[in-house]
């Protein structure tokens, strides 16, 4: 059942708050790593294992739990996962040993994937024209939840110890479960006629079938690895001499990141206008540039502030754009697309967490910054390579060519003989051929080329007078 009216602002806001609260549970530990290490006599050089196990749990949840959103009633699944999250948080708050702490962290990560079920559910409920805006608002809620989690956790730790934030979050999560049960729209969509195992396998099938998902998933791995290289070990230089900041002061840097994340919300609008690729490129460049001021952390906290804002602005702009792009690919598989994409996000976060603390133990803060900058550079290069690669066109959308001409455009339906089933009848633009070139059925448009659709082996016209290769519609 397709939505026939847009989601209200209040419901979108509830989705955003619920996502922010759920994902914040994963990040409370970041400014508290030194306190946890002291409480359980853990080596500070390996304390990153707490974040890594949480991200591993998150990755397992993405693979095993998120696809259930395409099989089961999403509303009930969301409420159940939220209730179980409250129990996992209580386990952390009452942990008597590091073993129970790590188990609670892994379970918290596993159940925090309710965030992605919420995102996919919101995308299903939204009308196509508001996909980018809805995803942008909810993603901003997620990011603000991540960043404010650090701030609130730091303040609570100074006031009442590191366990207090988990007790508070358990109570808030329980209240949110009740709100979601009362407010979430009752929406039933067609369910795939497949078993759970086949559904999980279809996540990997989507990677084979959808190049956009593959490209954006790898970008997610690299960008979130770079971000976690900053956030995981940041507490170590800030809490040590000569800075010796308190947990509250360390957590305040999360507010700086929140400012950058909120500014990235507009990336969804740009993606809706077809500017997703170039938004991604500019954002990746910002991420790379951010490591220069971050490297000056121990001599200037203002430089760190600038770097944090820039890094999170770039990170979230890429993230919002990627989600908007992949959700447009296969509307009937929103949860599985989310699972596949966010699985790479989780892998990148886990690798960045464990790698950054190891680099800090080996070479200090400068080594951490070199690692983060290197990963950001790889992400930028990868984006450029995928942009330069020649990819098939999609029905009704111009390919990625330079706009050297402004040809006359004829607007009409995309021919059924050309388009895949999901796109038949979709609006299309056809470039008018020059005088003497007969119009051929099934053409697609480009700004400077007149070409037939895939499977139609007829000559094509191009401004240079050459024969264009048939392109898939």
Q: How would you name each of these model-derived features?
A:
Residues 60-98:
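Conserved MFS/SLC helix-loop-helix module at the cytosolic interface between two early adjacent transmembrane helices
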């Amino acid at each position: 059942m397709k939505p026939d009216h847009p989601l209200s602002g209040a419901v979108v806001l509830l989705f955003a708050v619920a996502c922010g609260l759920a994902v914040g549970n994963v990040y409370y530990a970041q400014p508290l790593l030194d306190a946890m290490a002291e409480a359980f006599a853990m080596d500070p050089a390996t304390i990153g294992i707490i974040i890594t196990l949480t991200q591993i749990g998150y990755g397992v949840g993405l693979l095993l739990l998120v696809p259930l959103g395409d099989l089961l009633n999403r509303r009930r699944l969301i409420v159940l996962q939220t209730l179980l999250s409250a129990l996992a948080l209580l386990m952390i708050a009452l942990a008597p040993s590091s073993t129970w702490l790590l188990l609670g962290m892994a379970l918290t990560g596993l159940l925090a994937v309710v965030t992605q079920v919420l995102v996919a559910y919101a995308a299903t409920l939204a009308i196509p024209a508001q996909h980018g805006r809805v995803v942008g608002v909810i993603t901003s809620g997620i990011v603000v939840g991540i960043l404010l989690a650090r701030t609130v956790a730091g303040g609570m730790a100074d006031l009442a110890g590191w366990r207090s934030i988990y007790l508070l979050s358990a109570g808030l999560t329980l209240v949110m479960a009740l709100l979601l049960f009362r407010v979430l729209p009752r929406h039933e969509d067609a369910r795939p006629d497949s078993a759970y195992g086949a559904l999980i396998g279809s996540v990997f099938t989507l990677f084979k079938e959808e190049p956009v998902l593959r490209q954006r998933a790898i970008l997610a791995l690299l960008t979130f690895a770079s971000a976690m290289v900053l956030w995981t070990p940041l507490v170590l230089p800030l809490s040590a001499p000569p800075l010796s900041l308190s947990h509250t002061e360390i957590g305040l840097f999360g507010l700086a990141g929140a400012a950058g994340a909120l500014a990235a919300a507009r990336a969804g609008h740009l993606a809706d206008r077809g500017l997703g690729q170039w938004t991604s490129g500019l954002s990746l460049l910002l991420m790379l540039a951010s490591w220069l001021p971050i490297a000056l952390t121990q001599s200037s906290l203002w430089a760190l502030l600038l770097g944090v804002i820039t890094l999170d602005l770039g990170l979230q702009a890429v993230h919002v754009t990627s989600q908007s792009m992949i959700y447009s690919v296969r509307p009937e598989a929103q949860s599985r697309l989310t699972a596949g994409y966010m699985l790479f996000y989780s892998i990148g976060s886990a690798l960045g967490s464990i790698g950054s603390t190891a680099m800090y133990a080996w070479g200090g803060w400068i080594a951490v910054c070199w690692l983060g900058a290197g990963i950001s550079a790889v992400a930028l290069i990868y984006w450029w390579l995928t942009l330069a690669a020649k990819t098939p066109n999609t029905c009704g959308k111009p390919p990625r060519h330079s706009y050297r001409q402004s040809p006359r455009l004829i607007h009409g339906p995309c021919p059924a003989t050309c388009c895949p089933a999901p796109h038949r009848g979709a609006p299309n633009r056809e470039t008018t051929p020059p005088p003497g070139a007969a119009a051929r059925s099934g053409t697609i448009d480009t700004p400077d080329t007149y070409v037939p659709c895939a499977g139609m082996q007829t000559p094509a016209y191009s401004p240079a007078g050459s024969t264009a290769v048939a392109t898939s519609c």
